[in-house]
Amino acid sequence: MGGVNIYAIIESGGKQYKVTPGQLVEVDLFDLAEGDSIELDKVLMLNDGETVTIGSPTVPGAKVTATVAGHIKGDKVFAYRFKAKSRNHKKTGHRQLYTVLTIGEILTGGAAEKPARKPRAKKTNEVTTDGA
């Protein structure tokens, strides 16, 4: 397709997100004002268009910069408790708060791919003719 496919997989709030520059992402609430910038340094995987770097557990030196676009509430989640034969039930609801981030730049920080291992030497079974 014509463009360079740069993306990173980051971790925020115990969840993983695949992000690209310019993308809007809803993550768990950050205590930041709208317009503030944040650096997300838990980069689990990085694809810069040429090489793919997988961290163990994170890619050293890699960062993703983002700005806070706003705060929103998620859909309402209902919890219903019910006990049979006792007319006992209770319905409660909850709306999770999210922060909307605009992904700015994916910085590799000089993250380089590990050098490939050398192939093992092939074992050869030598047959001796003297019977030993």
From Swiss-Prot:
Domain of life: Bacteria
Keyword Cytoplasm found: no
Family annotation (NCBIfam families): L21
PANTHER family: 50S RIBOSOMAL PROTEIN L21, LARGE RIBOSOMAL SUBUNIT PROTEIN BL21M
Family affiliation: Belongs to the bacterial ribosomal protein bL21 family.
Function of the protein: This protein binds to 23S rRNA in the presence of protein L20.
Record's protein name: Large ribosomal subunit protein bL21
Gene (name only): rplU
